[in-house]
Amino acid sequence: GFVPSPPAWQREPRPTTLHPIADRWMRRGIPRPGSPAWRYLTVERGIPDTIVAVAVEQGLLREGPQGSMWAAHRRVDGALVGWEERGSQWRGFATGGAKELFRFGPAAASRVCVTEAAIDAISLAAIQVLRPDTLFVSTGGGWSPASEEAIRGLAMRADARLVAATDNNRQGDVYAERLRVIAAETGASYARSRPRAGDWNDDLKILVGRLAEEPVAAAG
């Protein structure tokens, strides 16, 4: 007949220990010319070295694993709450982190361009040559309550101008409409700035390609 056997012993899974967000951020390297994250941004994404250097100077970027880059999400007081993760084979957000806003440019700027990804915010800043009256922000994909609250705070500033610089697709239009409503409710001015291609990084790469061809055409 059937003889029951004692259950096989199994090791309890060891819980993964996550170090505090700020500690994990500080343990990562700062991108430098020629480093994996720097090459990803400048070679694969076409972002000028000068723009990446400014983002690094503002403390916004870190080296991620396997050649990826991390882009900081901070509260208005500067506290780090999470980061976007982007690489050739990877796209994600900090485990245990929170989405608020990636902020690139003058913190007190009255003009705020809202994008969906840090790379798009940096790309738009490059296209607009780091326009000095503009803060380029990213919600990190999606739309968290903290992101909306932060955008409302920016829109409530005196003479605030809210620019919906979201992607050129249906979801981008949905986010743009949310921004239009926020502007109407806070009294900020509003504009929709739509990339010609899918997103601002696509537009930047097209622009960089055209600029690279100009000397050849002139010599031709």
Region roles according to the model:
Residues 48-64:
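Short, basic/aromatic recognition patches
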Residues 29, 111-113, 162:
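Conserved hydrophobic helix-helix packing surfaces used for dimerization/oligomerization
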Residues 45:
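Short glycine/Trp-rich loop-beta-loop segment that forms part of the substrate-binding cleft
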Residues 126-220:
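TOPRIM fold recognition
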Residues 36-37, 119, 174, 178:
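Short Gly/charged-rich anion-binding patches and loops
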Residues 1-42, 170:
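Non-catalytic accessory segments of DNA primases and related replication-initiation nucleases
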Residues 62-155:
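Phosphate-handling DNA/RNA-contact segment within nucleic-acid enzymes
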